[in-house]
């Protein structure tokens, strides 16, 4: 008698083959044998990963770039693409230009002509300011549609013309009018391509500090989409010292200096030039400093200057033979990063200071700015609590500091261990006098930056093959952690993690770039003991990732190396949101683009009216709230939809901007007749703009229905039937396999068994095939009551499938999604029959 057995969760992800016999582990019961292109939700279910949207070509197709996130707030987020001595900016969002998300462009210049030649020549209305080697974006050209929404390299530039490098336009349709060209915004940087992996960054508001031991530290500052500056840091007080000091009683018996105190920041300047006085009862006059009301006065005694008073207002100080306080002296200028060999390799902010660490000459040394004065490294003798700080790790080995991370203590990660930098008490503020460095462990970190998740840190060990977490343990008063990748150690055999990014919302997934180009997903939720790994393959190699917040979720951007039309290319792509409303919004292809002609404004409606609503009948089509028609609308197809009922029409004659005559391609259901409908679309049977996939076979989804694969020719694919939403991109397959079934005691291991039926509890799913293994799959039949001509709805609930009932020793269930459709499995219930 078959016995149902439920697998209610997969919260352990893919387990290493070495653990396939460890049925005694709690994680075994929620683990998987294969998890390819599925990711694990924190609640234990699994979903096929969303596809990626093509954002644009990378700066250099021949060299690897690096993606770095820049986030001012949740509404203003960017991805910075660093290439060899260049940086380009991608605005967070979806689309091809900064207006709707994509590469940021400079101001556009109108086009006055484009030749049909090899290479094509573009003429602009006004001087374009372009130089040879620049990249430009062209769009809006009438006639020569093949040139639109594409990137081109500039060569042969004159004041108002330029050639399109390596682009033969002689076979394209002739340009007739219009169009604009805009240069990709590019910032020149000093960083060579080979040095990008070691470039460290930390951001505060609109400023990002970049550190690398081979370059002077710099601040990258944003003031607008196309307004970025990269400036070497100058480590000196921002407040100027008073000038024009003079004594009312000149002489050499006494000597005075003054400093200015900034009204806003409280920063104290360096000391002014000294002025002499004849005796101890003298006046000092000076020229005030803009932005400063207070001035400190210091008098010389036994070789040092000591504090004697403050000028609160005015420009004169009178000394009445005040004894100098030599425990309070003026700041002494210091710049520890003045020359090559002294440039820091990492930075962060902590406890009101900016911290730096790891120079070639001081690989284990930390430096901190003055409190609240981030570019001021000045000190005093004796020291003040607000002075800059210098500390060097004292350890048995010289292990370079690689990262600084601010949590409730300053964590210092070296190549050989983890240290805590603190004041000796959690309630105290770090000062030069109480700074303490205490070891927390001796694992070490790779060159991959640590990630903060909640109040824990994740880091990659120096080998690149292990991931550990680190969290404060009150019981032992220390930072403790464990290997969180040990259950999936097979994913790192012979491979290393080279980059990663944390997509916090909605599923808290750390996306890791493996050295072979495979993308790994790590669902991590420490408080619920969720540590789940998965593998994600694309038709290419992932080389860089970063994550930025976009609206209510975190978007992952990827640099992917692909082969297209026989050429190696590198593309920036964006993982699309999986929070879609229905199958029409699903995006399950890679490097994809989509045409979307569906109306989104409920005030804009379409109405068909006539005496006959059979297929082939003529009707009047009118628009309310908008005027979408023109003479060129003849031949345009439209779809009007009311729930599961829809009708397709073809425009046959133009009457006016809001009225046309049309023919019904299909019979109009009664609910669509003579009714204003807001759910309508301008339909098409082609999708253009796919030049980045020229010659590749792509998967297609049109209005929620899978179409036959098609090959991209001249940047275009065709589908059999006009649709309002067409998605095209590279296909990928999603495979899921459970572990050997265990129901003991007594154990089922080694006993023959078979599964005749399996129940998949699914959510928003379509297109799954299931079986005992990859060679014996049965596709789930899901269409039930949908109207003809409408897509099959996504299923939620239990799907019962009779599968190949062969006897075997494992009782595994294999599920595959081979179509560009979504699937989510929340539980698997096999009906198990056990033999001897």
Language-model segments: what does each one mean?
Residues 196-201, 353, 361, 395-604, ...:
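Beta-sheet-dominated scaffold domains
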Residues 339, 732-778, 828, 835-836:
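Glycine/proline-rich low-complexity spacer/linker segments in large multi-domain proteins
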Residues 263-278:
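Extracellular fibronectin type III
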Residues 4-26, 96-203, 211-213, 284-341, ...:
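Small/polar beta-strand repeat architecture
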Residues 1-106, 215, 219-241, 257, ...:
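N-terminal beta-propeller domains
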Residues 190-200, 342, 718-720, 749, ...:
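Beta-sandwich interaction modules
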Residues 88-90, 419-420, 424, 767-781:
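Short, surface-exposed beta-strand/strand-loop-strand elements in extracellular ectodomains
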Residues 251-264, 296, 319:
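Beta-strand-rich modules
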């Amino acid at each position: 008698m078959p016995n149902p057995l439920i697998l209610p969760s997969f919260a352990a992800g893919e387990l290493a083959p070495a653990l396939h016999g460890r049925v005694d582990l709690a994680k075994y019961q929620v683990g998987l044998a294969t998890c390819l292109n599925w990711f694990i939700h924190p609640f234990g279910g699994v979903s096929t990963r969303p596809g990626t949207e093509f954002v644009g070509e990378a700066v250099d197709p021949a060299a690897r770039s690096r993606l770095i996130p820049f986030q001012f707030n949740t509404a203003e987020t960017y991805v910075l693409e660093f290439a060899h001595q260049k940086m380009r900016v991608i605005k967070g969002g979806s689309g091809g230009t900064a207006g709707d998300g994509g590469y940021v462009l400079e101001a556009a210049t109108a086009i006055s002509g484009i030749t049909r030649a090899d290479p094509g020549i573009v003429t602009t209305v006004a001087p374009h300011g372009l130089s040879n080697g620049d990249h430009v974006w062209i769009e809006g050209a009438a006639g020569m549609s093949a040139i639109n929404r594409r990137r081109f390299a500039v060569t042969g530039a004159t004041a108002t013309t330029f050639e399109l490098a390596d682009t033969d336009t002689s076979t394209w349709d002739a340009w007739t009018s219009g169009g604009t060209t805009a240069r990709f915004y590019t910032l020149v940087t000093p960083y060579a391509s080979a040095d990008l992996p070691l470039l460290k960054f930390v951001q505060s508001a609109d400023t990002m500090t970049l550190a690398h031991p081979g370059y002077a530290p710099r601040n990258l500052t944003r003031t607008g989409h196309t307004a970025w500056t990269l400036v070497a840091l100058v480590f000196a007080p921002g407040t100027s010292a008073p000038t024009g000091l003079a004594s009312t009683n000149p002489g050499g018996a006494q000597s005075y200096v003054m400093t200015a105190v900034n009204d806003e920041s409280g920063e104290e300047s360096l000391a002014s030039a000294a002025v002499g006085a004849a005796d101890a009862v003298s006046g000092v006059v000076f020229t005030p400093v803009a932005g400063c009301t207070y001035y400190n006065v210091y008098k010389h005694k036994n070789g040092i200057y000591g504090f004697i008073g403050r000028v609160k207002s005015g420009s004169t100080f009178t000394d009445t033979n005040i004894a100098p306080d030599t425990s309070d002296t003026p700041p002494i200028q210091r710049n520890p990063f003045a020359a090559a060999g002294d440039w820091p390799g990492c930075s962060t902010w902590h406890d009101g200071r900016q911290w730096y660490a790891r120079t070639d000459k001081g690989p284990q040394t930390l430096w901190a700015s003055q409190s609240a004065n981030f570019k001021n490294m000045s000190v005093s003798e004796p020291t003040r609590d607000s002075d800059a700080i210098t500390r060097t790790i004292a350890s048995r080995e010289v292990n370079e500091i690689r990262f600084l991370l601010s949590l409730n203590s300053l964590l210092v990660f070296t190549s050989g261990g983890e240290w805590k930098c603190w004041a000796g008490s959690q309630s105290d503020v770090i000062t030069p006098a109480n700074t303490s460095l205490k070891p927390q462990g001796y694992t070490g970190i790779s060159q991959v930056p640590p990630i903060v998740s909640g109040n824990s840190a994740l880091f990659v060990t120096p080998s690149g093959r292990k991931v550990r977490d680190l969290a404060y343990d009150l019981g032992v008063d220390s930072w403790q952690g464990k290997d969180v990748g040990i259950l999936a150690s097979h994913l790192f055999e012979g491979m290393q993690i080279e980059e990663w990014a944390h997509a916090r919302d909605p599923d808290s997934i750390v996306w890791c770039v493996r050295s072979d180009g495979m993308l790994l997903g790590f669902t991590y939720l420490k408080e619920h003991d969720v540590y789940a790994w998965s593998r994600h393959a694309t038709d290419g190699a992932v080389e860089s990732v970063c994550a930025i917040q976009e609206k209510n979720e975190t978007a992952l951007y990827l640099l992917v190396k692909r082969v297209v039309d026989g050429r190696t290319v590198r593309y920036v792509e964006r993982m699309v949101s999986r929070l879609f409303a229905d199958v029409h919004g699903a995006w399950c292809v890679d490097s994809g683009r989509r045409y979307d002609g569906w109306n989104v404004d409920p005030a804009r409606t379409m109405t068909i009216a006539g005496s006959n609503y059979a297929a082939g009948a003529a009707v009047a089509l009118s628009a309310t709230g908008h005027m979408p028609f023109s003479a060129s609308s003849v031949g345009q197809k439209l779809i009007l939809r009311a729930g599961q009922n829809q009708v397709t029409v073809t425009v046959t004659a133009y009457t006016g901007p809001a009225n046309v005559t049309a023919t019904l391609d299909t019979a109009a259901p009664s609910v669509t007749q003579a009714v204003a409908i807001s759910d309508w679309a301008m339909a098409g049977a082609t999708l253009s703009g796919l030049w980045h996939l020229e010659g590749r076979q792509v998967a297609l989804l049109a209005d929620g229905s899978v179409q036959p694969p098609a090959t991209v020719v001249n940047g275009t694919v065709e589908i059999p039937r006009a649709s309002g939403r067409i998605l095209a991109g590279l296909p990928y397959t999603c495979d899921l396999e459970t572990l050997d079934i265990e129901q003991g005691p007594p154990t089922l291991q080694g006993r023959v068994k078979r599964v005749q039926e399996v129940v998949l509890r699914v959510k928003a799913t379509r297109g799954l095939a299931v079986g005992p293994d990859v060679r014996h799959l049965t596709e789930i039949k899901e269409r039930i009551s949908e109207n003809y001509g409408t897509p099959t709805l996504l299923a939620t609930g239990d799907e019962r499938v009779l599968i190949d009932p062969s006897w075997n020793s494992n009782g595994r269930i294999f599920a595959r999604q081979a179509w560009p459709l979504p699937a989510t499995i929340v539980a698997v219930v096999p009906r198990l029959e056990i033999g001897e």
